[in-house]
Regions:
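Family-specific signature for flavin-dependent thymidylate synthase
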Residues: 1-259
Length: 259
């Protein structure tokens, strides 16, 4: 089950962004940047930035998420968003004795497909652990033959075994990560990944992340979501044709945030 938490963010992110904008458009000194930046003036600066398309000040606000229960398939997609920082659970240093995996909804919905998928995952788990054990025993024997004490040899062999045994793990295998993005990168991420044409798992993640950051910085993310929330759909012939429904959905999310 996917779990997402907002574990840290820039303190007063909207005020920080407004201060950066104030510096750009006035002769204010660094020591005076925060003076007079009440909620109303902060909101005006942020609206101005959005109207002008001046996005660089928004980069001063960052958000850090803890994410688990997602697949390695998702990992391959989210790391394409390059202006971000990722720390991912290592399959090299962590032995996956408790093999967890993500079942796609379309597979879950078809009993025959689900049965075949679960059988495949069970077989993959067995092969992974069997291969890891064989590699560990082989590496231990080699290291001991080279003169290394058994306890030290087994510790080193275990890590070496994980390094190669992981090659049999499927894309469905669960992973955990900590991800940090600045607000501008998040806007782009939501623009692309909240779209109904995005792959289902990363779309679910993007929607959860949006739901977490919007209450913290509602003016920064006022026009965030899929592209059609704030303008015409850019997908052309690939458009889902549900722009009105999507806009209503995101209006509801924002209303529920109570800000």
């Amino acid at each position: 089950m996917m779990t997402v938490r907002l574990i840290a963010h820039t303190p007063e992110p909207e005020k920080v962004v407004a201060a950066a904008a104030k510096l750009c458009y006035s002769d204010a000194h660094i020591t005076d940047l925060l003076d007079g930046l009440d909620e109303e003036k902060t909101a005006k600066f942020l609206t101005m930035l959005s109207d002008l398309g001046h996005a660089s000040p928004i980069e001063h606000a960052s958000f850090t998420f803890g994410i688990e229960g997602v697949s390695r398939t998702l990992l391959a997609q989210i790391t394409r968003h390059r202006i971000a920082s990722f720390s991912v659970q290592s399959q090299r240093y962590v032995r996956l004795d408790d093999f967890r995996y993500v079942v796609p909804p379309e597979i879950e919905a078809i009993p025959e497909a689900k049965a075949a998928f679960l059988a495949s995952m069970e077989e993959d788990a067995k092969r992974y652990l069997d291969l890891a054990h064989k590699l560990e025993e082989g590496h231990t024997a080699r290291l001991m033959a080279e003169g290394m004490p058994e306890k030290q040899a087994r510790a080193k062999a275990s890590k070496q075994a994980n390094e190669d045994a992981r090659f049999v793990l499927p894309n469905a295998c669960e992973t955990k990560m900590v991800v940090t993005m600045n607000a501008r990168s998040l806007q782009n991420f939501f623009h692309l990944r909240c779209c109904s044409r995005a792959q289902w798992e990363i779309r679910e993640l993007a929607e959860k992340m949006f739901g977490l950051v919007y209450p913290v910085a509602p003016h920064i993310f006022a026009r965030s979501g899929p592209a059609c929330v704030s303008g015409p759909c850019p997908e052309g012939k690939m458009c889902c044709g549900k722009t009105a429904e999507v806009r209503a959905k995101y209006a509801s999310i924002k209303e529920a945030a109570g800000v």
